[in-house]
Amino acid sequence: MIDDRKLQILRAIIQDYISTGEPVGSRTIAKKYNLGVSSATIRNEMADLEDMGFLEQPHTSAGRIPSSRGYRLYVDRMIEFERLSSEEEGLIRNSIIDGTLYEVDKIIKQTSALLSELTKMTCIVKAPSVHKSFVKSIQLLKVDDVSILCVLVTDNGVIRNTVIKVKSVPISEELIKISKIITERLKNLTIEQINLEVISNLNRALSGYEDIVNAVLPALYESLKGDETSEVFLEGTINIFNYPEYNNIHKAKEILELLHDKKSISELISDSDDMTVKIGDEIFVPEAKECSIISAGYHVGDKSLGTIALIGPRRINYSKVLSIMTEVMKELNETLKNK
C-alpha cells in the first residue's frame, strides 16, 4: 500500500523527469515542488519508492528515474488530462477529411499524419484486414476496347481498383448488368469463401461472358489476398529520434529495425477497441521494453476496422498525448459513421 505522501513525491518525480529528461534528486523535488517536507524526508521516501519498484537508479547518476511500474501507477491513478489549445482543437476538427467523400484508408492515413504531427511521436496503423473483409460491391467500367476497370468496395470502406484485359469489352448496358450479377453473387463473401462452387455458379449466370468472370476473379484475389503484415504502416518514423533516449547508436539501430519489422510491430499493438497504454515491461517484444505504446481502435458502427497506435520512450508527456489521442479518435470515429 502506497500512502499519499509517497504518491505526491512520485508524481513530482515523474513530472520533473518527463519535463527535463534528467534523473531527479531529493533536493530538486524539495526546491521545485511545495510538498511541505524536508529534502531528507523526500530522500527517505524515494528510497522506499525504489524498494517498492516504482523508481530506478541509473548507473551514472545519484538521482532516480521512474520505472515501468512507476509510470503505470502514474497513468492509472495520478494523471490529469491536459487541456488542448484552441489551435490544436481546430486542427483536429479540420484535418480529418470528410468520410462521405473518401475511402477509409485515405481517412486513416490523414489521421495518422495528424497524430504524428500533434504528438511528435511515431504513429503506427494496423489497417483494415482487406483479405478478411466482405465484398460490398463490384463495378466494371470500360477503359478501352480490351480493358475494363474493376472497382471493388469492401464492407469496411476499402476501395481497390484493378484494370483487367479481355477479348472484347461489352457495351455499357451489358457491363452494368454483369456488374450487378457479380455483386449479387459475391456480396458478403470473403475472398476465402469464393470457392469453385461460387465460381461455377457465376459462370452459369454469366454464360457468354466467361472471359470477363475469369479475369475479374483473379484480379479480386490479388487485390484482397495480402499478407497480414502488409497492412501495417507508419507515419513520422523519425519523430522517435526527437527523444534523447535514442541518441545512443545501438538503441537507435534497435528501434529502427523494430519499426521496419511489420510482423513485430503488428504484435505490439493491442486489438482492443478501448484506449490502451502499455509501458515498458508490459510490452513483450524485447526491442520495445523501454517504450510506451498508446493504442485505440477505430470502427464503423459496431464493426471494428483496425487500430491506431503511438510509440515513444517511457518518458512521454502522458497527460498531453492521451488528451490528443482521445480527441482525435473521437473525431475519427464520428467521421467514419458516415461510411
From Swiss-Prot:
Disulfide bonds: none annotated. One of its GO terms (biological process) is negative regulation of DNA-templated transcription. InterPro entries: GAF-like_dom_sf, HrcA, HrcA_C, WH-like_DNA-bd_sf, WH_DNA-bd_sf, WHTH_transcript_rep_HrcA_IDD. One of its GO terms (molecular function) is DNA binding. SUPFAM superfamilies: GAF domain-like (SSF55781), Winged helix' DNA-binding domain (SSF46785). The keyword Repressor applies. Pfam families: HrcA (PF01628). It comes from the Bacteria. Keywords: Repressor, Stress response, Transcription, Transcription regulation. Negative regulator of class I heat shock genes (grpE-dnaK-dnaJ and groELS operons). Prevents heat-shock induction of these operons. HAMAP family: HrcA. Belongs to the HrcA family. This is Heat-inducible transcription repressor HrcA. It comes from Clostridium perfringens (strain 13 / Type A). The gene is hrcA.
